[in-house]
From Swiss-Prot:
Its EC number is 4.1.1.130. It comes from Scheffersomyces stipitis (strain ATCC 58785 / CBS 6054 / NBRC 10063 / NRRL Y-11545). Its cofactor is Zn(2+). The gene is COQ4. This is Ubiquinone biosynthesis protein COQ4, mitochondrial. Belongs to the COQ4 family. One of its GO terms (cellular component) is extrinsic component of mitochondrial inner membrane. It is found in: Mitochondrion inner membrane. InterPro entries: Coq4, Coq4_euk. Residues 1-31 form a transit peptide.
Amino acid sequence: MFARSALGRSDQLVTALNSQKRQFVLTAATTALGSLLFSEDNRLASQMEKGLLHNKNAENSASIPNTANKFFSRPEAEYPGHVPLYTFEKMLMFLGSSVGAYTHPERNEFIVALGESTAITPVLRRLQHQMLSDPVGRQILRERPRMTSTSLDLEHLRELPDNTIGKTYVKWLDKEGVSPDTRVEVKYIDNEELAYIYQRYRECHDFYHAITGLPIIIEGEISVKVFEYMNIGIPMSGLGALFAPLRLKKSQKERLYNIYYPWAFKSGLNSKPLINVYWENILEEDIDEFRKTMGIEQPPDLRNLRKEYFKKLKEAKKIV
């Protein structure tokens, strides 16, 4: 019993010593921290009294650029209608319009957004250099023509001889039920001249349909896009050539891969640069001579091929 009592007192003594030790360490740490704080306060107070602190901070603040404001400030518009975008906004527009254009290719707003979000500066600079290296291209950049039903005078074009470029163009417009007035203004490309170059490409698209005779149905659009990509190099046209056929039926893919892709590759590569064609000045020229001069072969009539296919399909069903 005596041993247990002695052992208990010993444990109490150890506990008390440990408690005192912890209290001592805590007190010492608090004292040291307080000393550092007071020392820092004293040092700052001394600098303030000598007039050193404020001068130093003023110099530092004047020398540090306001990078935060620069990063978050939106650039000013470079031309009427221009909408400057941050890089992450352009990426979001690209992703959203890519999905939209694939799932709903009939919706023009997705096609427009995808086209501008992929019209990267190096591609447009290459087209700019191509135009500046050609006398007609330089004339286009200098005069900045715009294509509308008024500027093209569609009524006059309807009176031209059948084999002229102008008559071929307006007949294609009437047959497909489209108008040059439907082309949307470019607004997301940051440089004013590059924006015009892309606008010019966009407005000339219907001429590429007209001179090749390809309709605005999905197969015709894809074929023209491949032709454009091989000649002009607009990225969206290449994306369309890769992904648009994935949604098509087997018969449509076969026509594209066996007939129209080979034609588009050959004609697009062999043709002179389409971006340098001043269409407004050659509307009364012979279209066959134009195709020959440019190096463009006319593809088989897509609508006739489709009619023949459906006719054979119908006859096969009757036989079965």
